[in-house]
Amino acid sequence: MGFFWALLSVGLVSAAQLLLRSAMVALPPLTDIVAFLQHLLHFQPGTFGLFFGLLGYLLSMVCWYFALHRLPLSKAYALLSLSYILVWAAAIWLPGWHEPFYWQSLLGVAIIVAGVLTIFWPVKRR
C-alpha cells in the first residue's frame, strides 16, 4: 500500500508542477502585485491553475505522509525522482508547451530510471 501512496504523491506533485507552470505563464509577474491580485480576485486565466496546482501540492503531501508510514524513506524518496521524468515528458508531449527534446535530457532520464531500479532491485541475502 505504501507504493500506491508514493506513486499517487508523485502523480499529484507532477500535475501540480505543470499547473503552476501554466499559471505562471498566464498570470502577471509578482512585481506588479496589483495586477496579480486583480487576476486572482477576478478569476482571470491562470487563477485556476494556481489554485489547483497548490491544491495538488497539498494532496501530494497528504499522500506522502501515508507513504512514509508504509515505506522505508530510502525507497520512498527514490520514487520522488519519477516526478522529474513525468514533468519532462509532459512538457515535451503536451500540446501548447513547445518544450524542446534533447538527447542529453533523455540520457538523464535513463540515469534516473537506472537509479530507481538499482534502489528497488531485490537483494539476495546470504
Curated annotation (Swiss-Prot):
<keyword id="KW-0812">Transmembrane</keyword>
<feature type="transmembrane region" description="Helical">
    <location>
        <begin position="77"/>
        <end position="97"/>
    </location>
</feature>
<comment type="subunit">
    <text>Heterodimer of ArnE and ArnF.</text>
</comment>
<keyword id="KW-0472">Membrane</keyword>
<dbReference type="GO" id="GO:0005886">
    <property type="term" value="C:plasma membrane"/>
</dbReference>
<keyword id="KW-0813">Transport</keyword>
<keyword id="KW-0997">Cell inner membrane</keyword>
<feature type="topological domain" description="Cytoplasmic">
    <location>
        <begin position="122"/>
        <end position="126"/>
    </location>
</feature>
<feature type="topological domain" description="Periplasmic">
    <location>
        <begin position="98"/>
        <end position="100"/>
    </location>
</feature>
<dbReference type="InterPro" id="IPR000390">
    <property type="entry name" value="Small_drug/metabolite_transptr"/>
</dbReference>
<comment type="pathway">
    <text>Bacterial outer membrane biogenesis; lipopolysaccharide biosynthesis.</text>
</comment>
<keyword id="KW-0444">Lipid biosynthesis</keyword>
<dbReference type="GO" id="GO:0009245">
    <property type="term" value="P:lipid A biosynthetic process"/>
</dbReference>
<feature type="topological domain" description="Periplasmic">
    <location>
        <begin position="22"/>
        <end position="47"/>
    </location>
</feature>
<dbReference type="InterPro" id="IPR022832">
    <property type="entry name" value="Flippase_ArnF"/>
</dbReference>
<dbReference type="GO" id="GO:0009103">
    <property type="term" value="P:lipopolysaccharide biosynthetic process"/>
</dbReference>
<keyword id="KW-0443">Lipid metabolism</keyword>
<protein>
    <recommendedName>
        <fullName>Probable 4-amino-4-deoxy-L-arabinose-phosphoundecaprenol flippase subunit ArnF</fullName>
    </recommendedName>
</protein>
<feature type="transmembrane region" description="Helical">
    <location>
        <begin position="1"/>
        <end position="21"/>
    </location>
</feature>
<keyword id="KW-1003">Cell membrane</keyword>
<feature type="transmembrane region" description="Helical">
    <location>
        <begin position="48"/>
        <end position="68"/>
    </location>
</feature>
<comment type="similarity">
    <text>Belongs to the ArnF family.</text>
</comment>
<keyword id="KW-0448">Lipopolysaccharide biosynthesis</keyword>
<dbReference type="GO" id="GO:1901505">
    <property type="term" value="F:carbohydrate derivative transmembrane transporter activity"/>
</dbReference>
<keyword id="KW-0441">Lipid A biosynthesis</keyword>
<keyword id="KW-1133">Transmembrane helix</keyword>
<feature type="topological domain" description="Cytoplasmic">
    <location>
        <begin position="69"/>
        <end position="76"/>
    </location>
</feature>
<comment type="function">
    <text>Translocates 4-amino-4-deoxy-L-arabinose-phosphoundecaprenol (alpha-L-Ara4N-phosphoundecaprenol) from the cytoplasmic to the periplasmic side of the inner membrane.</text>
</comment>
<feature type="transmembrane region" description="Helical">
    <location>
        <begin position="101"/>
        <end position="121"/>
    </location>
</feature>
